[in-house]
Amino acid sequence: MSRRGPPISAFAALSSADDDEVIGYEQSDEDPESVSEQRPVSEPPELARAQPSAPVYSAPNAPVVVSCSKFVPTSENVVYGRGYVVIGLKADEFLMVKGQYTLKIQRGAVQIDSILYHSSHDPVKIYGLSLSSIPLISAAQVTDQNLVEDTVLPETEHLFTPNYKSVIRLDDVFDGLEKLGLLYPQLKNIHPNREDIDEFEGSAFAKSFYPYSFKVVENPSNNLGTYINKTWKNALEALTSPSGSAEDMRVLVIGAKNTGKSTFLRLLLNKLAAHEHISPKVLDIDPGQPEYSLPDCISLTTHHKPIHGQYFPFLCEHPARICYIGFNTPQRQPIKYISQLKALSSHMDMENGPLLINSPGWIKGFGVEILKELTDAVRPTHLVYLSFGGEDDNQLLCNLTYENLVRVPVPGFNSRGYDIVRYSPSQIRNFRMLSYFHYNRYEKTFDFEPLLARSPYKISYADFCDRDALIRYPGLSGISILDAANINHEDLVECLETQVVAIFELENEEFINLYDEMVQRGQLGSLESYPNLFNNTLESVAPEFRGLALIHSVNTTAKYINLYTPIDVARLSKSLASNETKLVLVKGRSDLPTEELIPKMISKTALPYVTYAAFGKGAKSVNVRRNVQRKTK
């Protein structure tokens, strides 16, 4: 089915584009003034039988909100160990576990957000953070006894009775991510158990989880669990039914903000990836809220197993195709964005497997132009439209190209009515940026000590533009600024310090082509003691994106740049030293939290001219107003 509507100019559409919706963080009762270090394991208290906990249900014709476990803790069905907890689940019981942990199924089977797992020795690692809906772990029926590998231990033998359907073990994962709040306090409550034990208010069961990296949410809370209603279940089953050809499926999920696009796509991804011989691909084209990409990037990734909880793209073992956009919105450079989008689309047919497309929550103005270009390039077999309903639906759909329409109605949802904590898009972007820069790829841990407390990497740069000399130079060849707007070369240092840049490698032949193009167009600028300035966005060549870096400072006397980056610097240095590739940095407008530049942990006293409460004048970026018409006198 192919439908068409009147064409929309990308530039004209910018004037009518939606503004980003910001959902502010609401302080909760779990928001203490200080964050303490992890305490050692203590003996668990004796648990009294509690009343059954139940999820919080909304009013009729509104979405169901699950904010806690459906589980009755007793001294029998919960076994505490050093670094782990074993829990027995009865039929119809489920757990909402907040925090980070590995899950092992010791008896029977469980469902994690509709994905069935049988007992096995293979652990499932889960980051159940409250940045998004928290996975639910439900007791489930075994479907194939050949898949069951029960583990009976003396301490849990009493759980292997007809009273219990499933037995699971949760193990600690203290990898440093739980200390994010020390650097960025706005997100300290995405992890549990950050309160001081002496000030902790809660039941004996809640206190028993204090030493662990996770906790079972026992009572109604301000967290949100993943709930799959009947409409979603039917849509997911229709898309993954055996009658269809999953290998050839291309699914585009669209909808306005807060309709659950990302959650629906994640559930569909998991259903497909749960099959042994299916490896779905995800085309993530939302640079503002990327689920499967690095900050300010779009990507094409392949997934071989389900994803439960928070996903970290830099932990992916399989290489991804990444395009650096440099901005958190396509509005900045719409033509470049669409060009990058088409470049990614051209690689889709090189790998087998279904394709799922994670689109921005932007279905008006320039967002329609993006979706139109995307559907023309991808030709989706299924268009999943999560809609609140309205007259604008048909106007949107008639502009898009697709074969089958799956319309999923979305009831209105207001998180404030349920005291659900929601974080703003900027806070989530800060989380992704901080977790990326503070990950140690060698130790496979996070370290949220301020970057300023570490020694940066040093890289020399060229301040000359002689062709032969530049080709032989083993350091930084030049810097490209995506929105340079005829920047003065003498102001380059001020434009670079404390800024996030992308690291690109070019094969020598590609660099020679780029050099010749820039010379011909007058795009190569050099100034003594300053890095070379490339007024070129590198679109005409094929550079390899290596990752992001934060520039600490520029030393114009010794001609080197200090920077921080989590990428494999040793491999990059070896490649440059052997003169196999050339190095170029590209700067966009990536945001960095103030806490990274001026961390609170440096001093307990107030810093002059610095505030963490609000932006000062001139702190926010200024956008050019478009279509401003003034009357002449």
Task: Please annotate each region the language model reported.
Residues 261:
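Conserved lysine of the Walker
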Residues 115-117, 266, 294-296, 313, ...:
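Short coil/turn segments at secondary-structure boundaries
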Residues 2-249, 253-254, 267, 271, ...:
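Preference for solvent-exposed, low-hydrophobicity sequence contexts
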Residues 246-248, 254, 276, 281-355, ...:
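Nucleotide-state-sensitive switch-loop elements of NTP-binding domains
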